[in-house]
Amino acid sequence: MTPFGISVPASSGNVGPGFDSTGLALGLYLHLNVEDANSIQFYSDGESTPTENHFIWNIAENIANKHGIRLPACKVQETNEIPLARGLGSSASAIVAGIELANQLGNLHLTPEQKLQYGTEIEGHPDNVAPSIYGGLVISTVLEKEIEHIQLRDIDVDIVAYIPNIELKTSVSRNCLPDSYNRDYAAKASAISNLTIAALYSKDYKLAGKLMEEDLFHEPFRSELIPNFAYIREEAKKYGAFGTILSGAGPTMLSITPKGNGPTLQNNMSKLSLLADYQVEYIPIDYQGISIQE
């Protein structure tokens, strides 16, 4: 076996009002380095992990089983830059990594569409797995058993993330959402989402940022779970942000700011006393998606 590497970017789901349908790939990565070995070995950040208990390996075996093959003995070393349970798509990145691990070890020659299909079946929705596979901003939905998606690869903004030192499970954040919305409310929420995507495509980032903060699907309900939600949004605007939103289900928040302003915004926000325990990071948008290093 020729050694190879797999890199999968983080992702931010929803991007404001694009609830369960829009995601953005971000330049934090889950890396797998794979080499030949006499037995199956898996290491996470240098620590040996039993493969039967490892999520990524279990995903890889599941995909291999679908194709009627067994994965060969190998040594897999995982390193992960993506914070867990922070709304940055850590589970989706792990799913995509497992799918690609099976693809490479089993010579399955999976298409991106097949990877998206498998990832969506496992994750339950495509808004995080899609950008981790394709890169950029991806709008996607499941129609019957078919997944449709559109990718936007040219977004002239910078991203600054505010990552608190707390975890928030998606299941907890999802439980605070209403079971249904009345027709007028849903129509307005849908219109805001549609106009946000149109603004991004037309590069009207000022309008896009304004609309992102007008989400009605999830942020009004989840914001109560997020420390300093209103404060971060207000302060970021003072330093030039177009808008500030929850990343996925939270607790991380993201600011969209003019191209070139990211480092300045990051520097100013990191000095705020209320954010002393946060990682305030300027994170580039990833446009490559999953990548293989040989």
Curated annotation (Swiss-Prot):
What is the purpose of this protein? Answer: Catalyzes the ATP-dependent phosphorylation of L-homoserine to L-homoserine phosphate.
Write the Enzyme Commission number(s) for this entry.
Answer: 2.7.1.39
- Membrane-crossing ranges are none
Catalysed reactions, semicolon-separated: L-homoserine + ATP = O-phospho-L-homoserine + ADP + H(+)
Q: Which HAMAP family match?
A: Homoser_kinase
Q: Which UniProt keywords apply?
A: Amino-acid biosynthesis, ATP-binding, Cytoplasm, Kinase, Nucleotide-binding, Threonine biosynthesis, Transferase
Statement: the UniProt record of this protein carries the keyword Coiled coil: no
Any one Gene Ontology cellular component term annotated for this protein: cytoplasm
The record's subcellular location field reads: Cytoplasm
Q: Which family does it belong to?
A: Belongs to the GHMP kinase family. Homoserine kinase subfamily.
Q: What's the protein name?
A: Homoserine kinase
Q: Which biological process, per GO, is one annotated for this protein?
A: threonine biosynthetic process
**Major place of localization?**
cytoplasm
Q: GO molecular-function annotation terms?
A: ATP binding; homoserine kinase activity
